[in-house]
């Protein structure tokens, strides 16, 4: 699953009709600069995914897209690490939470930036060993930040400090 039109086209996959939700355990979170550790229970490939993180600022339930920005405290960088082979192992029963929920698989930071009125002007860039590996404008997202906050808030209550990785 991905949340960008250009990447969907590049990979030759269908545009999703709705976003994929999954919850990460608090033990997966680490701060910027901490080391992502491959678990002993997994011997496959570990991949990075640079993503925009939306930080919720106040309790949020059933808000519209227009109201969503009033519930966003700010934005952060997110490295949504994945044990990719766990998802691919059985396509009929993908292990999303396990593949993304290992200890240290949720890196955020180094800070939270508030006061961004139009997140569509942001660009997600991932640089690994001085090489740019990802470069996607938020405006190319299938489900943009305000839409994601609205959609998720209609399914579950969002609390202050919750982080939505945008995919």
Predicted regions mapped to residue ranges:
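A generic structural signal for short beta-strands and their flanking turns/coil linkers
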Residues: 16-18, 25, 48-52, 71-75, ...
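Conserved hydrophobic/aromatic beta-strand scaffold that supports enzyme active sites
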Residues: 21, 28, 53-55, 107-111, ...
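A residue-level signal for conserved active-site and pocket-lining positions in enzyme catalytic cores
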Residues: 1, 54, 80, 108, ...
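Non-heme Fe(II) oxygenase catalytic core, chiefly the N-lobe of the double-stranded beta-helix
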Residues: 33-68, 73, 77-82
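Catalytic-pocket segment enriched in acidic/His residues
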Residues: 7, 37, 84-167
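Extended, compositionally biased flexible segments
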Residues: 1-50
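Short acidic/polar capping segments at secondary-structure boundaries
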Residues: 3-4, 26-29, 51, 58-62, ...
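Solvent-exposed alpha-helices and their adjacent loops that cap or buttress functional pockets
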Residues: 13-15, 21, 43-48, 65-70, ...
């Amino acid at each position: 699953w991905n949340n960008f039109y250009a990447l969907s086209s590049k990979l030759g996959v269908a545009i999703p009709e709705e976003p994929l939700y999954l919850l990460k355990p608090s033990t997966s979170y680490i701060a910027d600069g901490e080391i992502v550790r491959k678990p002993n229970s997994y011997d496959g490939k570990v991949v990075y995914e640079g993503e925009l993180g939306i930080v919720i600022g106040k309790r949020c339930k059933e808000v519209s897209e227009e109201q969503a920005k009033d519930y966003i405290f700010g934005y952060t960088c997110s490295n949504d690490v994945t044990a990719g082979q766990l998802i691919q192992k059985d396509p009929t029963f993908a292990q999303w939470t396990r593949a993304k929920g290992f200890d240290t698989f949720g890196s955020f930071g180094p800070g939270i930036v508030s006061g961004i009125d139009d997140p569509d002007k942001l660009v997600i860039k991932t640089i690994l060993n001085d090489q740019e590996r990802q470069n996607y404008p938020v405006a190319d997202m299938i489900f943009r930040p305000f839409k994601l906050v609205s959609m998720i808030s209609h399914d579950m209550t969002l609390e202050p400090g919750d982080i939505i990785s945008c995919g």
